[in-house]
Regions:
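Histidine- and acidic-residue-rich, metal-dependent catalytic cores
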Residues: 1-367
Length: 367
């Protein structure tokens, strides 16, 4: 069962406690059967815009990954450094140098190269927050050099050749940094996203990066959290823009007139810093705020994402508590989510056994 099936399940489960809240904050929130169906349709359609999102961006699981993971290319450069070190050592021995001292220096240098590579490889995974010291080490490693003797502008696509032509070709052989942010790594937009227009008819308020993609190696490896660059995150976030355009141009019947608003609110935040319209909680319907909680919980607990490990119930609720505290999701609906036991009902139906751990909901309440 994929997210398109799981999100409707959570949203439907979460909606009922709000409907049944006779004396609390949601006592005036009542649902007809048409309302329930409207939410159901909206939850099925909430990510329909992803049909135009490149799959390799959605599934990007390492920092250097594009269509393939460029860590393999980077690893070969480290191998070249090791071969060069061995060749330099042998040349020095042949020239009459102290063999024992040179061999000891070689052993130390090879160990240093190995350590640098494994640091870069670990950084590529993006599992931990990358602090300033780690970013500085990436740059230091990148400044090491290797010699390229072959022309890198042959055997490539027309588009890539055009990007290379922005800069003069160096004379070969050329000494280059081990890791680079090159001009040809910057890929411009063919057409500027219409959502960037402040006068767009949909009310989108988005910040558009200067480039469509930035494939710089140091730039990507220096991502602070996760594996996505700002450019890639914009492309992924654009799915909700496309969802809104699709749904708002459908001739929906009156009973489904709020489907676009409900479906397209799951990336908005209560404090108005969300996407794509920067709506505040007061500007969102209860159903749209329910969708936001459903989408977050499904994403955190999903076991079928290639770019992240699945989280347990307790891990997921802890993250959601931080989001509620920061006014990124509706605090009252989040508490209702806990008190009603929706999280547990969903877990029993959809989560793997090793994800369902003991949960004390009092630990995850937000004052």
């Amino acid at each position: 069962r994929g997210p398109c099936q799981r999100v409707p399940a959570i949203a439907t489960m979460q909606n009922e406690p709000a409907h049944s809240d006779a004396t609390g904050i949601f006592k005036d929130f009542k649902l007809s059967e048409e309302d329930r169906y409207e939410l159901y349709v909206a939850s099925w359609m909430h990510d329909c815009g992803k049909v135009v999102t490149p799959e390799y961006v959605v599934d990007k699981s390492t920092k250097l990954e594009t269509i393939t993971d460029r860590i393999h290319e980077v690893r070969v450069r480290f191998e070249v450094l090791k071969r060069d070190a061995e060749i330099d050592c042998l040349k020095a021995i042949i020239a009459g140098g102290d063999a024992a001292a040179l061999q000891a220096a070689l052993t130390a240098r090879l160990a240093e190269i190995d350590a640098d590579y494994y640091f870069i490889a670990d950084t590529n995974v993006g599992g931990e927050f990358l602090d300033d010291d780690a970013k500085a080490r990436v740059k230091t490693i990148a400044e090491q050099t290797w010699m390229r003797t072959l022309n890198n502008r042959v055997g490539i696509s027309i588009e890539e050749r055009k990007r290379f032509e922005r800069t003069p070709a160096p004379e070969l052989p050329v000494v280059e940094p081990l890791l680079m942010d090159r001009e040809d790594h910057l890929i411009p937009y063919e057409v500027q996203p219409f959502s960037a227009d402040p006068d767009n008819p949909y009310g989108f308020k988005v910040d558009v990066p200067e480039y469509k993609f930035n494939k710089g190696e140091v730039y990507n490896l220096s991502i602070s959290r996760g594996t996505l660059t700002n450019e890639e995150r914009f492309i992924i976030n654009d799915h909700i823009v496309q969802t809104a355009v699709m749904l708002e141009n459908l001739p929906l019947p009156k009973a489904l007139r709020r489907v676009p608003e409900i479906a397209c609110g799951h990336h908005e935040k209560i404090d108005g810093t969300g996407y794509p319209r920067k709506l505040t909680g007061d500007q969102m319907s209860v159903q749209a705020r329910v969708m936001a909680i459903a989408d977050v919980f499904e994403a955190l607990t999903a076991a079928d994402r290639p770019y992240k490990d699945r989280k347990t119930l307790s891990q997921s609720l802890r993250i959601m508590s931080f989001m509620a505290k920061d006014n990124h999701m509706d605090r009252d609906l989040y508490h209702l989510f806990l008190d009603s036991g929706v999280y547990r009902d969903y877990a029993d139906k959809f989560l793997l056994e090793d994800q369902i751990d003991e949960v004390d909901i009092e630990e995850y309440r937000v004052a």
